[in-house]
């Protein structure tokens, strides 16, 4: 083994259930064994786990429930305690304690809460405790959900200061096409940069059960790689896959980390789930992408969602493509009022101003 490294392992529903309605405990035992072996060798392990709803449904005897958010949250509330109990029981076989962290998007959007979550996670790791992270599905609404555990795992990797992020799924990795419908599909072993062509390939692929398909795994890889974290998509069923990844053995698809990673604040901006969205005109798009300029109110065409000053927002071009993320200098209502106006008009329109730009270039990351 090499010197101590920090690894985040994301386990999707398809991996934990094997495609069935219930948790595949035998397989989870094997995954824990692999993690415990690495832990004993001095590595730091973080688990991002799905499966709370599946565990809740199993524990309640597969009840007939209406297909509502409330039903899913009921199952998550029951299942989350069962899930963490399972992780605790299995890791305790190896004398390892686990610590549960349940997160929502609000913990990522707010810089102070983000830093608090980081400090908690790193304190667990510093004390040889394995953090087990999941989205707080029992209380999360659509407005406060990260949305899927792929993107949550990328945020966890940033919080942990991880060296590697391993996304385990029911596929061997990212293919040139969906291997289940195209026999000519080939495994892509190495990726050195994520572009629109690769996003198009991922958009046509499906990774099985759960909320995250290949497109969300690509989003997670993009966030992690730009933060300097190697990311691997691999099959959770492959024997010894977790140890192989830590040994540097080629498995699945390896997304190579960016050579010059983003500094810490910009990692937060890039990784935080956007609280809202603004659409900008062609001139603003060119200024942002080609000249690295700040976004002026004049270039804003529309504002979507409700957000506060200081929150991270998504910036899209007229075709709806996500071109940048940035910290808004104004709340959503104020941006709607000053959209399309020159900067010198801000004070007259609002009665105050926080500067001449809507999003400053120092607080912006292009996609």
UniProtKB/Swiss-Prot annotation:
**CDD domains from the xrefs?**
AAK_G5K_ProB, PUA_G5K
For the protein in the UniProt heading, the enzyme class is: transferase
Domain (PUA): residue spans on this chain: 275-353
Nucleotide-binding among the record's keywords? yes
Compartments where found? Cytoplasm
Got a GO cellular component term for this one? cytosol
Q: What family does the database annotate? A: Belongs to the glutamate 5-kinase family.
Name of this protein: Glutamate 5-kinase
One BP annotation, GO: L-proline biosynthetic process
Species the sequence originates in: Escherichia fergusonii (strain ATCC 35469 / DSM 13698 / CCUG 18766 / IAM 14443 / JCM 21226 / LMG 7866 / NBRC 102419 / NCTC 12128 / CDC 0568-73)
Record-listed substrate binding positions: 50, 137, 149
Q: Sorted alphabetically, which InterPro entries does this protein's record hold?
A: AceGlu_kinase-like_sf (IPR036393), Asp/Glu/Uridylate_kinase (IPR001048), G5K_ProB (IPR041739), Glu/AcGlu_kinase (IPR001057), Glu_5kinase (IPR011529), Glu_5kinase/COase_Synthase (IPR005715), Glutamate_5-kinase_CS (IPR019797), PUA (IPR002478)
At the top level, the lineage of the source is: Bacteria
**Pathway listed for it?**
Amino-acid biosynthesis; L-proline biosynthesis; L-glutamate 5-semialdehyde from L-glutamate: step 1/2
Task: Summarize where ATP binds, as residue positions.
Answer: 10, 169-170, 211-217
Mention one GO molecular function.
RNA binding
Keywords from UniProt, A to Z, are: Amino-acid biosynthesis, ATP-binding, Cytoplasm, Kinase, Nucleotide-binding, Proline biosynthesis, Transferase
The task this protein performs is described as: Catalyzes the transfer of a phosphate group to glutamate to form L-glutamate 5-phosphate.
Task: Establish whether keyword Glycoprotein is in the entry.
Answer: no
The protein's matches in HAMAP family, at most eight in alphabetical order, are given as: ProB
